[in-house]
UniProtKB/Swiss-Prot annotation:
Belongs to the cyclotide family. Moebius subfamily. Probably participates in a plant defense mechanism. This is Cliotide T18. Contains 3 disulfide bonds. The presence of a 'disulfide through disulfide knot' structurally defines this protein as a knottin. It comes from Clitoria ternatea. InterPro entries: Cyclotide, Cyclotide_moebius_CS, Cyclotide_sf. It comes from the Eukaryota.
Length: 29
């Protein structure tokens, strides 16, 4: 629910644990 995980997810995948893709950026749950 929180911004921001420091990566984009244009590929649809977030590599940071605990983060999900909220296109086009990863966000913490």
């Amino acid at each position: 629910g929180l911004p921001i995980c420091g990566e984009t997810c244009f590929t649809g995948t977030c590599y940071t644990p605990g983060c999900t893709c909220s296109y086009p950026v990863c966000k913490k749950n």
